[in-house]
C-alpha cells in the first residue's frame, strides 16, 4: 500500500536480514498513523548507509504487534501481544495472573495466520534462527523464553526469566534482558527521565538454554532495558524509558 511522505512513524520492534535476493531488508513494526509493518532496503553509499522505503503491510484489526522476525524468502513472523484496546486494569491482571493474551503469527502469501502452540502472556521479542529452524519468543508477562521448531511445529525448550523483552543472538549465545521487579513496583519511577529499578542481563547457551552468565544492576544511571547487544567486549543496552543508550564491559 502507499504512504503519504509526511506520515509520522511510531516504530516498535525491528528485524534486519540479508534476503534471498542479496538485499539487506529491514522490517519495522509501526503504530502510526495506522498499524503496519514497514519494509525498507538498507544500501551502502560512499559515505554512509541509507534506507529506502519499499512498502508496508497493513495489520488486521485483531492484531497488535510488538516485534517481527524476517525469513529470507520475504515472509515473516510477528508477535501479537494483546488486544489493541486493552485497559491498564486488564494489563495489570495479565501481568499478575500470567493470562493468555496473544500468540505468534506468520505472514505468508499475503495472509496472516496464527502459529499453533504459541499462545502465552504478553508475547514480546521474537528472533528466528532460520539455519536451525528455531524461533525464539519472549513472553514478557509470562516470564519466560520459549523456543519452537518451526519445521516440526513443536516447542523444544523454555527458560524462566522475569519480564523479558527483546532477544539478540551472537556466537552461539542468546542475550536477554530481565526486569527484576513486579508491575506494581514502579511507583513514581516512570515519571523520571531515567528509571533505575533493578534489572539483569542473561547470557544463555543457544542450544541448551543453560545460563552462561548473568549481570545484575540496581540504582544506576540506566534502567528498564529492552535489548542487550554484545560488541567489542562491551554490552550495549536500549531502554523503553531512558534518554540514552547504556553499556557495560562483559569482564
Please tell me what each predicted stretch does:
Residues 2-18, 53, 58-76, 82, ...:
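Beta-rich, blade/repeat-based domains predominating
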Residues 28-29, 78-99, 177-196, 247:
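Short, conserved, GDST-rich strand-edge loop motifs in beta-rich repeat architectures
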Residues 34-40, 101, 144-146, 186, ...:
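Structural motif
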Residues 224-251:
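Blade-level signature of beta-propeller repeat domains, shared across WD40, Kelch, NHL, RCC1
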